[in-house]
Amino acid sequence: MSLFHSNTAFTASTLDIEAEDIQYFLSLMYGAIVVTLLIFQRLFSFFRVRTYILLTCSLSILILLGISLTRDPFLIGILRVIEGIFCVLEGACFLPLLMMQIKHTKSRTIAYFFLYTFMLTGSTLTTSLLKESIMDYGWQDMIHVVLYWHLIVIAIALLLLNNNRLGKKFPLYQLDLASCLFLLISLSCGAYVLIYGRKYYWFECSTITINFALFLIFGSLFIIKQRMVKRPLFHFEILRYQNVIFGVILFFLFYIIRSCLNNVYTVMATVWKWPWHYIVDVQYINVLGTILGVGSSGFLLLRDVSPKYIFGFGFLILGTSCFLFVPTFYPDTTIWAIGLPLFIQGIGQGWLFTPLVIYILTGVESHHAGNAGLMGTTVRFWGTNVGFALIQNASYTLNQKHYIQLEQTLNTNNPLTINYWNTLMEKYTGIYGDQIAGRIASKSISGTLSQQASLISNMEIFTYLGILGMLITGLIFLFGSAKTLFMRLRMPYL
């Protein structure tokens, strides 16, 4: 049910605010999730299960009520941080509960497959559930719908769960809350730099410079404090494990490639002018692919297939989907044309996500598993924000470049240009007069050029991402051979 917290897309469309603002609100929440995972196990062990769920759900309802009653962006930002804390407290407890119910030698792996299937498909599912409320009523009513779902969770907890503990009770003392605060400030400031950097011309703006400095200062304070305390929240020793390093790198690259999917939905809305409720339905093509990908990689993982083949084929599928998107970026595309790459992209992300997590977790000693999982969550935080920043900057730069190129090709001696201009003038002259009609016609041509520039830019972006996917695939399959060759060449000098 914590997945219902994350959907702010329709709030953005109703309030007409910038994409950067929505991304930053999500990043505030996700940064709070990363920080709370440091102390989640202590909090979960302190309470009995039913009491814990009732408490977190009740507080989540109060937070949602607060969000529905305010329009102050600063206050909403604070509430999003608090919401992120209770989001993970509410959601993360279901993983150990699920593991206990699965009678299998690999219950943890199966439980993770369930969890990440919901995480990858949750935004589309929750969007569909909230669609009717936002269409017929408003964004406050949308939040109330989320609130009602939490009431259902409370009813389930009261009726079906007992009040036993899953393990030994740990008292809530010696919690290193100062380190949590340092990390939260560092993540929030770092996310601000990545998300708003292009908008404010990076370090030409004092706000960006200050946030970058705060990111470095509080990040350093967190690291220093963790090195000094006897019982650190995060053990940096896990960075010595090969699985963690490789898994983190692959996870980061996975999120860079995956971040381009938002561009597809943006083109659907701004260029092809598809209704947003129709775009929601189209996303189910991607959901079906994701479920198929999760099931396929899960079958291979339970059969102990080498991670090299799972990762290699996963990035091959992602790269192929990027190449298949390229020819769909035309003004007259159809759902049948865009459906295939959407489906294949879903297979790729579903195929890779859980195996990457399991690869990181199984590569460390059992007492470091929690920190390894936190590394994966942190990489998702940075991967999402870096991917957003990269795609935003690439889209902006390429759009400007292609717009200028297209504008330069307009020639008043070209019959096509003359006919198009005359058609627009005839359309608007009878309504507005010659002078206003000329302005509207110029604006219409500018809008058409912007749309064409956007389509060409996306062709270029997806081509580069497809090449990246293929390069990663090649490196995965060749890494073992290259490492062996390197060691052989190095042996005479050792």
Residues covered by each model-derived region:
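Helix-loop-helix hairpins in multi-pass membrane proteins, especially solute transporters
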Residues: 39-41, 45-178
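Membrane-helix boundary/linker segments in multi-pass transporters
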Residues: 159-171, 192-279
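Extracytoplasmic
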Residues: 1-31, 35-37, 90-91, 261-265
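Helix-breaking motifs and short loop linkers at transmembrane-helix boundaries and internal kinks
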Residues: 16, 48, 69-75, 273, ...
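Hydrophobic transmembrane architecture of multi-pass small-molecule transporters
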Residues: 384-481, 487-494
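Symmetry-related core transmembrane helices of the 12-TM Major Facilitator Superfamily/SLC fold
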Residues: 141-159, 179-188, 208-215, 405-416, ...
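Central cavity-lining transmembrane alpha-helices of secondary-active solute carriers
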Residues: 26-42, 88-95, 284-297
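12-transmembrane solute porter fold
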Residues: 1-9, 26, 233-399
